[in-house]
Amino acid sequence: MAKDDKKKALDIALKKIEKDFGKGAVMRMGEKVDTQISTIPSGSLALDAALGVGGYPRGRIIEVYGPESSGKTTVALHAVAEVQKRGGTAAYIDAENAMDPAYAEALGVDIDSLILSQPNTGEEGLQIADTLIASGAIDILVVDSVAALVPRAEIDGDMGDSHVGLQARLMSQALRKLSGNISKTKTIAVFINQIREKVGVMFGNPETTPGGRALKFYSTIRLEVRRAEQIKQGSDVIGNRVKLKVVKNKVAPPFKVAEVDIMYGKGISQTGELIDMAADKDIIKKAGSWYSYGDDRIGQGRENAKQYLEEHPDVYEEVKEKVREAYGIDAKAIEERENPEKVKQDKEVPVNKDASDEKK
């Protein structure tokens, strides 16, 4: 077949595919408009830096897993709050029936506009998730948690009945269906998962996550959340130091670690992580126990430095901008990814001819 005939045959095939399956079903990579990864901030500056792209990528699956009470739900709720701040719509599939509206509100979540579902079975929860995602109206959907998505057969059966691999099959089937809609609608799907231990493992890591291997494969990002140490005020425990490890990342280099303070009743301490990140880049100087910014001493000890930044929002914003720049979490770069057309229009604003003539 001649080269021109091949080109014509390919064009006919492409047109037929578009007619049968809709525009965008197939395209040349050079024609694809959305070559940049569009993201939404995670609610933690340290985590945004660790993720490598400034936040959670749109149209992708994120798995957040870890031991009990490590801060998994807190991490997910911060992402929900960030989406809502930007005018987006969030949905929450509460399979554990453990949603605390007061705590979510303290983290900045708009409870009134949050779409909440508490399904009775795993099939029901995943069907609701698929319907919401397919609508194209949801920006972020959280499933809390995969371990609580119990198959109907297990709920209807008797205690002690064996249902080997039932939940894994359910997740595998659901993710095959969900992944396409998630990508098309640019929805961020966050699956919270628990940790289990394999019986009889002598060597290697005995820990695993429920729901089979499908979620591991389909996830663009896998976040491991673990408590590092307690945060105390005198003898009272007021929070936990938490490590967020990016175990898998398809959009940037993996294995980066972010450390954050999760305070009881308040969530991630954004001021605390800002001080740590600024100190690492010498934006805030640390000499002994004293913290200094510019020529000013801002506090003796980390807690006093945090208090200073909380009381001086102008200094806080100034330090934040410098930290974003130092770590490559540039707000302008994110805007270019989010609104490339708007940025292009701003760049193409015509110069006032009279003003330019006067300069000459």
From Swiss-Prot:
InterPro entries: AAA+_ATPase, DNA_recomb/repair_RecA, DNA_recomb/repair_RecA_CS, P-loop_NTPase, RecA-like_C, RecA-like_N, RecA_ATP-bd, RecA_C_sf. Disulfide bonds: none annotated. Residues 330-360 are annotated as: Disordered. GO terms for biological process: DNA recombination; DNA repair; SOS response. Keywords: ATP-binding, Cytoplasm, DNA damage, DNA recombination, DNA repair, DNA-binding, Nucleotide-binding, SOS response. GO terms for molecular function: ATP binding; ATP hydrolysis activity; ATP-dependent DNA damage sensor activity; damaged DNA binding; single-stranded DNA binding. Belongs to the RecA family. This is Protein RecA.
